[in-house]
Structures are given as structure tokens and as C-alpha cells.
């Protein structure tokens, strides 16, 4: 018997944003594992699933482990155990399975080693509705970075002349650490926007100075922070572009 894991994206918000393929998978599968029930569309999905179907959440694993790496390893182990005893297991994750989802590559690796097929069912990621909420086209140089990575840096490894979206600013302490890193490159009064529940009915935007980013209480698993670019020619990258232009064949003859 062939075994298969179907990783399904729940999208960023309400059930209306689910793809048809995701809806069909979630409402008809015999076994569904939710990485978390803390998602706007989960309640309606559960209401539409047959009473005889098996559904399990992984929220309990977040309280059993202190480090995210251990949580993700436990989630992968849970899905793999079910996949080895059932023909198909649907594993549902927020957003898109391949955007900011650490369990997806880990599960793909474990499944490949066990000879279990993996199928990705796409979902709308948080990126599109977040950029849409602040009126920015991400194709205009948009940068998307996990807030945790920025918080671990002393100086932000970003281009300050381009739009920046910080993902998963889920707690006030994380917002504080992010703020301290960003203040090494942006002025205190630089206006940033906290994007809450992008694309959902309860979407909220709060614009405030960077120095006050961590003053509010509006941080959870649906929170992103948008940082607008600084004026042109205010970064080292811009200086490199200027020097390259001057030294180019069509540049300044004195600099070649």
C-alpha cells in the first residue's frame, strides 16, 4: 500500500481564502493533523469534517517543549507515525506550506527516507495580503525576513532603501529585540506599520515610530511589521551602486 502525506496550506485568514484543492483535502480526508488550531478558518473546517474522521492538533507540543526546534521535531514525528499506519495523512499549516514553514522541509526529508510520498497543496501566504494592506507591490524590491532572524542580529542585514516586511512578530519581547536591531540602521522616528491579521475581516494596521514598536500589546501569531524604505542614497548598497555607475563605461571618465 502506498503511503502519502499531503501538506496543505490554510492561507493567512478566513476560510474564503482557502484554495479549492485545500478545502477538498481538509474536509474529505480521513486523517488530518493541524499544526495549530489557532487559525481563523479551522473552526469552519472542523465543522465540515465527517464525525467519523480523525483530526489532531499539535498545539499540545508547544507546551511540552521549550525550543521551537524541538516542537517542530515532535510535530514531524507525530505526522510520520500516522503516515506509516494510514494510506494518506493531511497535514495542515498556516499560510503556504513552503513559505516560512519549518516543518515542511523536515517532513519532506523524513518522508523521503521512509519511502512516503509528499504532495504540497498551495495556500495563500501572509506575504501578499500583508503587502497589499500597506499598499506596496513586493516586486518593487520587497524584502521578507523572519523577525526572529533580525532579532538575533546586532545590525540588520537588510537594504534600508527597499521595503521590508518582518514576519511572525508573535510577542512583545520579540518586537523589542527587533526594534533594538533596526535602530542600528533606521532613525528613532522612522514610521513603521504593525500589520495584524492581514487579509482577514479583523485586519488592523497601526503606524507608529520605530522607537515605540514594542509599546503596544498587539502581537500574536498573525502579526507582521512593515518597515518603509529610507530616502534614496542612504545605504552602503546605494553607495556601491553609485561607485559602480561612476566606474562603468558610460560613467565618469575620471573614475574609470
Segments predicted by a language model, with ranges:
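Beta-strand/loop-alpha-helix module characteristic of Rossmann-like adenine-cofactor folds
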Residues: 2-8, 24-27, 31, 37, ...
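Class I S-adenosyl-L-methionine
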Residues: 1-121
Amino acid at each position: 500500500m502506498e503511503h502519502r502525506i499531503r501538506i496543505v496550506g490554510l492561507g493567512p485568514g478566513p476560510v474564503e481564502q482557502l484554495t479549492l484543492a485545500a478545502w477538498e483535502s481538509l474536509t474529505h480526508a480521513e486523517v488530518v493533523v493541524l499544526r495549530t488550531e489557532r487559525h481563523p478558518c479551522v473552526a469552519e473546517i472542523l465543522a465540515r469534517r465527517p464525525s467519523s474522521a480523525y483530526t489532531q492538533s499539535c498545539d499540545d507540543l508547544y507546551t511540552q517543549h521549550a525550543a521551537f526546534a524541538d516542537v517542530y521535531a515532535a510535530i514531524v514525528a507525530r505526522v510520520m507515525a500516522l503516515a506509516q499506519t494510514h494510506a494518506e495523512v493531511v497535514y495542515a499549516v498556516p499560510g503556504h506550506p513552503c513559505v516560512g514553514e519549518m516543518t515542511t522541509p523536515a517532513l519532506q526529508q523524513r518522508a523521503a527516507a521512509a519511502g512516503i510520498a509528499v504532495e504540497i497543496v498551495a495556500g495563500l501566504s501572509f506575504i501578499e495580503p500583508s503587502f497589499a494592506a500597506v499598499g506596496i507591490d513586493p516586486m518593487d524590491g520587497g524584502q521578507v525576513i523572519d523577525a526572529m532572524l533580525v532579532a538575533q542580529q546586532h545590525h540588520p542585514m537588510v537594504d534600508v532603501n527597499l521595503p521590508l516586511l518582518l514576519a511572525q512578530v508573535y510577542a512583545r519581547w520579540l518586537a523589542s529585540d527587533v526594534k533594538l536591531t533596526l535602530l542600528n540602521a533606521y532613525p528613532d522616528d522612522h514610521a513603521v506599520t504593525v500589520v495584524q491579521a492581514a487579509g482577514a475581516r479583523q485586519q488592523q494596521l497601526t503606524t507608529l515610530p520605530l522607537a515605540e514598536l514594542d509599546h503596544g500589546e498587539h502581537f500574536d501569531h498573525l502579526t507582521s511589521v512593515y518597515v518603509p524604505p529610507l530616502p534614496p542614497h542612504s545605504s552602503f548598497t546605494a553607495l556601491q551602486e553609485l561607485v559602480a555607475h561612476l566606474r562603468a563605461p558610460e560613467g565618469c571618465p575620471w573614475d574609470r
